[in-house]
Amino acid sequence: MSMLCYTLIIAFLIGIWAAPKSEDNVPLGSPATSDLSDTSCAQTHEGLKTSRNTDQHHPAPKKAEDQELGSAANIIVDPKLFQKRRFQSPRVLFSTQPPPLSRDEQSVEFLDNEDTLNRNIRAKRETHPVHNLGEYSVCDSISVWVANKTKAMDIKGKPVTVMVDVNLNNHVFKQYFFETKCRNPNPVPSGCRGIDSGHWNSYCTTTQTFVRALTMEGNQASWRFIRIDTACVCVISRKTENF
């Protein structure tokens, strides 16, 4: 009987010693630890993703110099505005650099200095010699490319804002106007050259015409007709005879 009791006690102790260990004592590399690592990695990835999204919603502040760009250069113009040929004028030019000189060599505002002007005039005289055929202009005019034109009058006589710089396809173009005006209202003491001062009063004056230019209307760019100087003409009137 006592032998049977000892046998049962030994079998019970062996059963307890051979029981499975708890998950708290699971060795590294076991499935329980792998699940925990995966969960921790997922939480870390989620934290990084949340931080990245937060950075996107709250970007870093821009530099002051980036915020102080010219208002005209920041206005992006739709390229479709330039697809219609009826909006183009030979006296309006959009360019990234100053236009070339006019044929009469009087558009000197874009030249570097007086020496450059003299060299250009001498070169032109050598290439195209001028022959004195007795032909003179009634009025002396000067033609120049005008830059930085900001104000003008439209076809209704109202003042409008002219765009100086145009942002087109990430390139900044300047709007130039080719204007012609009188050099002197009285090229000769009597008025216009070649006019009979005994019977006529005369003087030279600048006339204007309308060209399509890119203007600002609210916060949008639009085409409008504006006045610019385009010619110098002679105005005459008959003298009254005193009897």
From Swiss-Prot:
PROSITE patterns: NGF_1, NGF_2. Nerve growth factor is important for the development and maintenance of the sympathetic and sensory nervous systems. It stimulates division and differentiation of sympathetic and embryonic sensory neurons as well as basal forebrain cholinergic neurons in the brain. Its relevance in the snake venom is not clear. However, it has been shown to inhibit metalloproteinase-dependent proteolysis of platelet glycoprotein Ib alpha, suggesting a metalloproteinase inhibition to prevent metalloprotease autodigestion and/or protection against prey proteases. Keywords: Cleavage on pair of basic residues, Disulfide bond, Glycoprotein, Growth factor, Lipid-binding, Metalloenzyme inhibitor, Metalloprotease inhibitor, Protease inhibitor, Secreted, Signal, Toxin. Residues 48-66 have a biased composition (Basic and acidic residues). The keyword Nucleotide-binding does not apply. Belongs to the NGF-beta family. It is found in: Secreted. Expressed by the venom gland. One of its GO terms (molecular function) is lipid binding. Coiled coil: none annotated. Glycans are attached at residue 148. It comes from the Eukaryota. Residues 19-125 form a propeptide. One of its GO terms (biological process) is nerve growth factor signaling pathway. Homodimer; non-covalently linked. GO terms for cellular component: axon; dendrite; extracellular space; synaptic vesicle. Transmembrane segments: none annotated. Its main location: secreted. Disulfide bonds join 139-204, 182-232, 192-234. This is Venom nerve growth factor 2. Residues 1-18 form the signal peptide. PANTHER family: BETA-NERVE GROWTH FACTOR (PTHR11589:SF10), NERVE GROWTH FACTOR NGF -RELATED (PTHR11589). Residues 48-69 are annotated as: Disordered. The keyword Cell cycle does not apply.
